[in-house]
Design a protein with these regions (language model features):
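DPxDG-like acidic metal-binding loop motif
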Residues: 2-59, 63
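Conserved S/T- and glycine-rich ATP-binding loop of Class I adenylate-forming
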Residues: 13-14, 82, 144
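Short, isolated positions in well-ordered beta-strands
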Residues: 37, 69-71, 159
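Short helix-loop capping/hinge motifs at secondary-structure junctions, enriched
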Residues: 61-64, 68-70, 196-199
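Short loop->beta-strand "edge-of-pocket" segments that line small-molecule binding or catalytic clefts
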Residues: 63, 70-92, 96-110
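Oxyanion/phosphate-interacting regions
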Residues: 100, 114-230
Length: 230
C-alpha cells in the first residue's frame, strides 16, 4: 500500500476508439489515502487540433487553459439540456414520476471520464453511471468537486458523498487503501451540482434485490436462447 497512488485510464471509450468514433479520452488522477486530489482528462475535440485538457487539484479549482470551470446551475434537470443515465438504470433503480417528468435529455457518448469532464465544464446537467471502475471516475471526481459540484455513490444503506474510495470498500474501516482495492472498486456514481444531485438521488428508488435477481435471470436466459438460435 501507499499514501499516493496514480490511477490512470490511458483510453476510456475503447469501443468508440476502435470503431473510429472520436468520443474517447485519457484520464489521470493522483489518489492520496483513497481521495482523488489531482486529476486531468484529455479529450480529442473536433474544433481543435490539440484537443481539450481539463484539470484540477484539491482546493485549486477546475480549469481548461486559463478559464476556471463552473458546474451547471439548477435544482432540477431542465428539458432540452443533456444528462447521462447509464443503461443499468432499469436493472437497479426505478425513477419516480418527478424524475420522469424532469429528467433532462439523455445523451451518452460512451466514455465515462469524458462525461464527467463535461459535468465539470457545465455541458451535462448531471451524469449517472451504473458500475464504473475507479479508473473511470477518479479524475472526474476531483474535476467535478473543484468546479463546484458533488459526487455520490450508492451502497445498501443508500446514497453517500463519494470523497474517497475508502467509503465503499471494506465498510470504510481499512487503515490504508491499496492498488488492489482500487483495482476492484466498482459502484454507481452520480455527479452534478449539489441541488441537482439531491433531486435525482431523492427521486431514484432502488429496486429490491429479488427484483434485480429476477431481471438478471431473465436477461441471462434471453441471451442464452439467442446464442443457441443465431
Amino acid at each position: 500500500s501507499s499514501r499516493l497512488i496514480w490511477v490512470i485510464d490511458p483510453l476510456d471509450g475503447t469501443t468508440n476508439f476502435s470503431n473510429g468514433l472520436p468520443s474517447f479520452c485519457c484520464s489521470i488522477a493522483l489518489v492520496e489515502d483513497g481521495e482523488p486530489v489531482v486529476g486531468a482528462i484529455y479529450m480529442p475535440w473536433p474544433e481543435t487540433t490539440e484537443g481539450r485538457i481539463i484539470h484540477a487539484r484539491k482546493g485549486g479549482g477546475a480549469w481548461e487553459g486559463g478559464v476556471r470551470l463552473q458546474i451547471a446551475p439548477g435544482n432540477k434537470p431542465v428539458s432540452g439540456r443533456v444528462v447521462v443515465r447509464g443503461g443499468f438504470l432499469p436493472g437497479r433503480f426505478r425513477p419516480n414520476k418527478d424524475l420522469l417528468a424532469n429528467g433532462g435529455q439523455q445523451r451518452s457518448i460512451g466514455s465515462t471520464a469524458s462525461e464527467l469532464a463535461m459535468v465539470a465544464d457545465g455541458t451535462y446537467q448531471y451524469t449517472l453511471h451504473g458500475n464504473p471502475h475507479s479508473w473511470d471516475v477518479a479524475a472526474g471526481i476531483i474535476l467535478v468537486r473543484e468546479a463546484g459540484g458533488t459526487t455520490l455513490s450508492h451502497n445498501k444503506k443508500g446514497w453517500y458523498p463519494l470523497t474517497t474510495f475508502k467509503d465503499n470498500t471494506l465498510g470504510g474501516t481499512q487503515e490504508a487503501i491499496t492498488q488492489e482495492t482500487l483495482r476492484h472498486w466498482q459502484s454507481p456514481v452520480l455527479s452534478g451540482n449539489p441541488e441537482m444531485v439531491g433531486f435525482v438521488s431523492d427521486n431514484l428508488l432502488p429496486l429490491p434485490l429479488s427484483t434485480r435477481l429476477l431481471r438478471g435471470t431473465k436477461k441471462a436466459l434471453k441471451l442464452s436462447r439467442s446464442n443457441r438460435n443465431p
